[in-house]
Amino acid sequence: VYDKSIPTVEAIQLFDDFLCELSKRKVQTFIISGNHDSAERMAFGGRLMKESGVYVAPVYAGKTQAVVLEDEWGSINIYLLPFVKPANVKRFFEDEQIENYTDAIRVAVEQMKLNTDERNVLVTHQFVTGAKRSESEDISVGGTDNVDASVFDEFDYVALGHIHGPQKIGRETVRYCGTPLKYSFSEIHHKKSVTIVEMKEKGNVEISTKELAPLRDWCEMKGTYMELTEKAYYENLDQDSYMHITLIDEEDIPEAVRKLQVIYPNLMKLDYDNQRTRGKAAFLEAAEVEEKTPFDIFEELYEKQNNQEMNEEQKKLIHDLVEKIWEGGH
């Protein structure tokens, strides 16, 4: 829901307005916490909100209770499974073999005791193997957060969160709807949309999408400063788009950001692509690697991907592996 565990006041107010509008329109709403959210904060007031048709998943405590809806074809059981790590599940099922994310979700699903004669829907927030990522999502080392899609086989529909690009995983009824807005320039080619799922009798699921048009789109441009500031170039562009501009001038343009923002007020990123920047990048990359040991390189990679340092046990393991490999070990 949010992009941090303690969201800004503005973000909370916006979400509150959104939920109030849905409730006014008698739209039943189902919410789970994601990997950026605080599950405890998200769950606050959940028991009160369900009286208004807003269902918030509680903090995972070893079981997932279905919300049962009724229509002319019978019951629809909606299960809300927030983002969980293997440790979150293992603490409740110490006798189960839980070594990775797939094991954790498999055990969590087994505890739901699905009635497969009825329609079952799962709302969850995990990275399912095979999904296409963008730069906006957190990535775990070596794909350790992967969940195999087979754990969802008994559900009639699985609504997934976490990946920003809309896509199906394996079958049509396991889907990421994606984010409603673009979050980085790596998503510039995404077609953002809302997924509409119509369920009739058991086994009859129709899926369609409604494309979303943002107030401001994202745009990338490349050229010389003179080219990009010519009226003939920009007069037919949406100048209010969020811009990433790459200048190819050999000399830096003084106060380029300030000058470009006169024409492109939502300039988000400015780069140069010329002989100097290409040479500097190549020199730095080669020099930095040559000066570092294999252990230093691995340690830096680990810190970048995990936002924390290795512990002493991990450091010793890597030291030993490096010594074996670089000193002729097998």
Over which residues does each language-model region extend?
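Conserved beta-sheet core of the metallophosphoesterase superfamily
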Residues: 50-51, 129, 134-203
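Divalent metal-coordination and catalytic microenvironments
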Residues: 15, 34, 78, 125, ...
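Active-site environment of divalent metal-dependent phosphoester hydrolases
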Residues: 2-6, 32-42, 62-65, 85-88, ...
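Short, conserved loop/helix-junction motifs that constitute active-site signature segments
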Residues: 23-25, 114-116, 150-154, 235-238, ...
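Accessory, non-catalytic peripheral segments of nucleic-acid enzymes
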Residues: 199-330
